[in-house]
Amino acid sequence: ALNSFTCQSQQNMITPPYLQKGDTVAILATARKNIDDNLKPTLDLLHSWGLEAVIGSTIGLDLNQLAGTDEQRAADFQKQLDNPNIKAIWCVRGGYGTVRMIDLLDFTKFKQHPKWVIGFSDVTVLHNHLNTMGYKSIHGAMPVSIPRATPDAISSLKKSLFGEPLSYSVGPDKMNRFGSATGELVGGNLSILYSLLGSQSAIDCKDKILFIEDLDEYLYHID
């Protein structure tokens, strides 16, 4: 039998305004460079949803494995964070580097005009930091993965952004456990989660539902 669960709004967290047709989404890089990535499928997708797109200054920057210096990536993110006309920030890809710029960011204007931050993998740094501040964010597909994203991944992202009800079905597995639970969903990439322990961006998992994603992670790294 399939396990299923439904995502509902948590009243104790701050929800950024859901998107409406005509809103603008900023696409930028907080971590790895994306020199060879084709953003056309992502732009076409946003336009099909009735949304506009702004390309950040970090798209195309190349500094070793990173999309520019820590200061360049932080400045690009800060610009979109402070712009009230930007309703969502979509991180183009993961990799490594977001943790190097998180302490350079000022969320003062974000608190005045909250917006959605979207991504997975290395973007877990931002999700966790926002969670400590009491804000919701979206762990979802990124522009670099859109060409190979499943229909379910695309659909759930759209529903999350536009405030539509979400539900998931999980296939049978011997590790599944049946039951009921209600709580705030936290987590993200495992290697990022343990790297943030002891920092101001570390999440409190007590009485919450912990979600973990990763691959090729060794047990001794988290022992």
PLM features: residue spans?
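Short histidine/acidic/glycine/proline-rich micro-motifs that form metal-
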Residues: 31-34, 143-147, 215-217
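Short glycine-rich or small-residue beta-strand-to-loop segments that form or flank ligand, phosphate
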Residues: 26-29, 87-91, 210-213
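ATP/pyrophosphate-binding catalytic subdomain of soluble kinases
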Residues: 154-223
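Bacterial Sec-dependent signal peptides at the C-terminal "C-region" and cleavage site
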Residues: 1-11
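ATP/NTP phosphate-donor binding region
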Residues: 9-85
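Active-site histidine-anchored catalytic micro-motif
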Residues: 66-176, 180-184
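Short, well-ordered alpha-helical microsegments
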Residues: 36, 98-99, 126-127, 194, ...
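Phosphate-coordination loops involved in phosphoryl transfer and adenosine-cofactor binding
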Residues: 21-22, 114, 207
